[in-house]
């Protein structure tokens, strides 16, 4: 998911130019796995809109080419959702198979799609009949599942949402994160900064969960105090705000969109990466530490802040779409003052095991 925003503009450009929906009778172009994939997409899209998770985003209305694969990854069938042109050889699915979506069976590009995706699960700007689509694979195991965390629909909603970033949203003034010549993350991971990062990861652990408006505002103030302190230590940390705006919003949408669809909700939390206090065992080099704490953690922290903004009654959709980062929005809704930094930073340290946090940060900072 590291590079998707850079390449998603073309895929959504002209997404309103799909061919008119044609009504057909009962069809037999799909199997149970396919039908479940379409049903999941429809339910998730409806959930995102109807629950006010993100009422300007309808995932099921975007141009998508889905490829079903077997358990070895070999492509078996392809389906164009919301085709942008009349594709020769494509067959329209009836409502008995499509869950009411505009879906066409088209196997003519399944191998090309799989080649473009390669060892990943998805790709942007895949060309079908001269038009650009988001493409993704799915299979029986990641479709016929009761897990809100491991189903393929979760990834689909996340990645398609990135098209909204590129096509509609105003980008924040903060800079994106650059990569070095080897494609690695360049992010400060001093012991002092790691302590503060782990502190807000502990603060957000277990979200989304029910909190009152006053609790949400209090947690947001602690977060703002921590991030403001990070920035005062190293202004480069401002780039985390952009990351929370881009990846955090997509993480929020994918998590909330699947929240009520599956019986098994374990791991369907914003901070689904391993607990930071055990990472000194699994992260072996400083490069790995920088990659995790300079990129991965902002998916969950951004989503957590947006969840708290929602609980505080703030119009986060409008703010994010106008280019405010979650950090900036949190400062607005809490009416945060710089004089409160030491107060809420101290509260966060007292509420969580600060000595344990310091020891974890020490171990991580000593990686070579």
What are the residue ranges of the model-derived segments?
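Non-catalytic terminal regions of proteins
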Residues: 24-52, 56-57, 69-71, 101-103, ...
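Short pre-active-site segment immediately N-terminal to the catalytic Zn-binding motif
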Residues: 139-156
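C-terminal motif of bacterial Sec signal peptides marking the signal peptidase cleavage site
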Residues: 13-14
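Active-site recognition of the HExxH zinc-binding catalytic motif
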Residues: 154-167
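Post-HExxH zinc-binding segment in Zn-dependent metallohydrolases
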Residues: 167-232, 240-266, 270-280
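Long, internal scaffold/assembly segments composed of regular secondary structure
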Residues: 226-333, 337
């Amino acid at each position: 998911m590291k590079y998707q925003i850079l390449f998603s503009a073309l895929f959504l450009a002209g997404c309103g130019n799909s061919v008119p929906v044609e009504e057909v009778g009962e069809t037999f172009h799909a199997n149970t796995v396919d039908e479940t994939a379409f049903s999941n997409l429809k339910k998730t899209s409806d959930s995102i809109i109807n629950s006010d998770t993100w009422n300007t985003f309808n995932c099921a209305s975007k141009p998508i080419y889905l490829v079903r694969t077997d358990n070895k990854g070999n492509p078996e069938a392809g389906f164009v959702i919301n085709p942008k042109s009349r594709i020769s050889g494509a067959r329209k699915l009836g409502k008995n198979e499509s869950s009411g979506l505009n879906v066409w069976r088209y196997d003519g590009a399944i191998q090309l799609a799989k080649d473009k995706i390669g060892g990943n699960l998805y790709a942007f700007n895949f060309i079908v009949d001269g038009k650009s689509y988001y493409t993704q694979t799915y299979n029986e195991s990641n479709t016929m599942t009761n897990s809100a965390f491991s189903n393929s629909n979760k990834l689909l909603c996340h990645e398609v949402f990135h098209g909204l970033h590129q096509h509609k949203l105003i980008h924040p003034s903060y800079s994106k994160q650059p990569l070095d010549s080897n494609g690695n993350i360049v992010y400060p991971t001093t012991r002092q900064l790691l302590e503060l990062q782990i502190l807000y990861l502990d603060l957000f652990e277990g979200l989304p969960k029910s909190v009152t408006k006053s609790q949400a505002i209090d947690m947001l103030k602690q977060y703002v105090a921590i991030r403001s302190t990070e920035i005062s230590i190293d202004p480069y940390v401002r780039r985390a705000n952009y990351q929370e705006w881009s990846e955090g919003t997509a993480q929020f949408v994918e998590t909330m969109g699947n929240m009520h669809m599956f019986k098994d909700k374990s791991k369907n939390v914003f901070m689904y990466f391993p607990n930071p206090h055990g990472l000194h065992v699994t992260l072996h080099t400083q490069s790995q530490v920088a990659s995790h704490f300079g990129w991965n953690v902002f998916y969950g922290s951004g989503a957590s802040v947006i969840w708290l903004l929602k609980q505080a009654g703030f119009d986060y959709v409008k703010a994010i779409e106008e280019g405010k980062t979650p950090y900036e929005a949190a400062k607005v809704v809490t009416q945060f003052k710089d004089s409160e930094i030491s107060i809420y930073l101290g509260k966060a340290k007292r509420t969580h095991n600060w000595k344990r946090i310091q020891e974890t940060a020490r171990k991580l900072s000593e990686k070579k």
